[in-house]
Design a protein with these regions (language model features):
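Short, Lys/Arg-rich, polar N-terminal cytosolic tail immediately upstream
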Residues: 1-2
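N-terminal maturation segment of proteins
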Residues: 6-619
């Protein structure tokens, strides 16, 4: 038997060193994995819990919930309850504490970025929860009473389960509206009652959006669209003819016996709250209204700039736009006589499909192509019942996992043809919301990123982009008109762009005046008079709209200015390597996010290869 040699001191030291190194590596890897595992567990729980708590929201986020771990859910509308709101606040505090216990440096780069976004978002949510009755879910501008029917009408049916979920949600609309009425009653008791004039507007909407006459004649859009959505399921034999008939009967019954009475009960309840002594006023008139406005501004726009700095940005941009308007008018003096004329017939395109095709062609060199197959879009008109209460146009966001079919709604009562329709389609379609959404969703899935990111919403990021590309579309239109030999019309398109920018800038400044500085109607009317708005009714409409929708104009226009600021910084950082294509790809790849996070991302951003693999080139 061979005798073992004794271990030398040097060998012993080497062995101990190896063991210590190995142990350190194990602890190091364990530490990293522990933080990653905790983050994965927390975010998975957040995502599934959020999806299960609101089926309507889940359906618009996910086509196939089970593929994202959302199973065994019960169809539910998220009804208001004061105790539930307090419980939700406590859950948010616990989640935030759990996230802050995680060390972001020990997460992967995508998870570390998400950690930052989640913590900032939850901090803002908690800050806003300290103002329980400042929010207005029944705003006359875009409240639940007008938004819910659209969401129901566009609720896609891919499976039998989708139809049954939809009917279950429709059956809960009475409880849902009743809970909103409770909120309004609690709000009134707390001294935050909605002005009587606004309550009258909401009641009028309740009386006209769903009517007995339309339901009795089977002409209401919630009847006709339901039948249209069932047809493909019947054709593909996902449901039988007998099942389709039963579903149709059930839908009619619920519309007549649940939704219609729900609207009536809501309107009657709001009537009891009307107090003619309560007049429209900004948030600054409320206790701690300025503090709430500051927090709401962060939430709605994603900008963390102080209000004084925002006012400075707006004032400087206003002066710039004003000077540009003067230059155009001086260069093309003949343009003045065309300003008040209807030029829609002279615009080269009248069909929305032609306009979208032209937009896609002109944007091709400056925007990354969509990954994967083409995304179809259907342009629809808003139902006549909803025209008075809807925005001029809107894009219904496609689910994360199904971007094949997309819908853009045009409110024909507020959006004429010609140049305005062209730029509106750019805002809502290409290169606006539709393009931004499809690009994000497909890249997100291809990269296998954490679905909890889909819980985050950044209005300034989205609407700022849509306004940014809308202004690009005015340039596209000017080029198109020049190609057609319409030089004056091309100059007019440039003037329209500058005028729209000036108007949105002015309204954004007025938003701050009303909600932060407590400007009265008389003060705002005087300002508007200086800019040509001499009709007192028009001034009142502008004032009321801004009172009803604080930060709404800023969501668009401050978002737009933040993008311009990022773009200017990118030019400085990248120097000769800067192109609009690279900047647009940065913005799309690093978002959605708040602008503070986007600025941080820009500092370390490396310009990638120009064309992603397996992409759909624009025509």
């Amino acid at each position: 038997m061979k005798k073992h040699s004794p271990i030398s001191f040097r060998q012993l030291l080497f062995g101990l060193g190896f063991l210590l190194t190995f142990s350190g590596m194990v602890l190091f890897l364990f530490s990293y994995r522990r933080d990653e595992k905790r983050f994965t567990n927390i975010t998975a729980q957040m995502f599934v819990s959020d999806m299960k708590s609101n089926t309507l929201n889940m359906h618009y986020h996910l086509a196939d919930p089970a593929a994202f771990g959302v199973t065994d859910y019960t169809p539910v509308l998220s009804c208001y309850d004061a105790k539930a709101a307090l419980h939700s606040q406590a859950e948010t505090e616990n989640t935030l504490a759990a996230l802050k216990a995680i060390r972001p440096k020990k997460l992967s780069a995508p998870d570390a970025a998400l950690w930052k976004l989640l913590t900032r978002s939850l901090e803002n949510t908690l800050a806003l929860s300290g103002f329980p009755y400042y929010e207005e879910p029944l705003s006359p501008v875009s409240g639940t009473q007008s938004n819910l029917p659209i969401l129901l009408a566009e609720y896609s049916f891919r499976t039998r389960r989708d139809v049954e979920d939809y009917l279950a949600l429709l059956d809960q609309t009475d409880e849902y509206f009743a809970s909103l009425l409770v909120y309004e009653q609690e709000k009134a008791d707390a001294g935050f009652i909605m002005p009587a004039a606004f309550l009258k507007e909401v009641r009028n909407q309740c009386d006209t959006i769903v009517t007995k006459e339309a339901l009795e004649t089977d002409t209401h859009f919630l009847q006709t669209t339901f039948q249209e959505r069932l047809a493909p399921l019947l054709k593909e034999q996902i449901i039988t003819a007998e099942e389709a008939s039963l579903y149709l009967a059930q839908n009619d019954r619920l519309l007549k016996t649940v939704l219609l009475p729900a609207y009536a009960a809501l309107g009657d309840g709001l009537l009891l709250l009307e107090d003619d002594s309560v007049l429209p006023a900004g948030l600054a008139s409320l206790p701690e209204g300025q503090a709430y406005y500051e927090q709401l501004l962060i939430s709605e726009t994603g900008s963390y700039r102080p209000i004084a700095e925002i006012q400075q940005m707006l004032t400087e941009q206003f002066s710039l736009e004003y000077e540009e308007i003067k230059k155009i008018a001086d260069t093309y003096p003949e343009i003045i006589e065309h300003i008040t004329q209807d030029n829609t017939e002279s615009f080269p395109f009248h069909d929305p499909a032609q306009m979208l095709l032209d937009l896609r062609s002109r944007m091709a060199k400056d925007f990354p192509a969509l990954p994967g197959p083409d995304a179809t879009v259907t342009v629809k008109n808003v139902s006549a019942n909803l025209e008075p209460y809807c925005a001029p146009a809107f894009y219904l966001t496609a689910p994360l996992d199904d971007t094949r079919a997309n819908s853009i709604y045009i409110n024909r009562s507020k959006t004429p043809d010609g140049l305005e329709l062209y730029t509106t389609l750019a805002h809502e379609g290409y290169p606006g919301h539709l393009y931004q959404t499809v690009y994000h969703n497909r890249c997100f899935l291809d990269a296998g990123l954490n679905p909890a990111a889909e819980l985050l919403w950044y209005g300034g990021y989205q609407e700022g982009w849509a306004l940014y590309v809308e202004f690009m579309a005015y340039d596209y239109a000017a080029s198109l008109l020049s190609e057609e030999g319409q030089k004056t019309a091309a100059a007019l398109a440039q003037l329209e762009a500058r005028n729209r920018s000036l108007q949105l800038c002015l309204y954004s400044l007025i938003d701050i005046m009303i909600h932060y500085e407590n400007a009265s109607f008389d003060q705002i009317a005087k300002i508007l008079e200086n800019f040509g708005v001499t009709d007192i009714g028009s001034a009142r409409s502008i004032y009321n709209y801004i009172v009803q929708s604080p930060c709404n104009y800023l969501k668009y226009y401050l978002g737009y200015l933040e993008i311009l600021s990022l773009q200017e910084h990118a030019r400085t950082l990248w120097g000769a390597d800067y192109t609009d294509y690279h900047f647009h790809r940065f913005y799309l790849d690093c978002g959605p996010a708040d602008f503070l996070s986007l600025g941080e991302c820009l500092e370390s951003y490396e310009i990638p290869d120009p064309t992603p693999a397996s992409s759909t080139a624009f025509p």
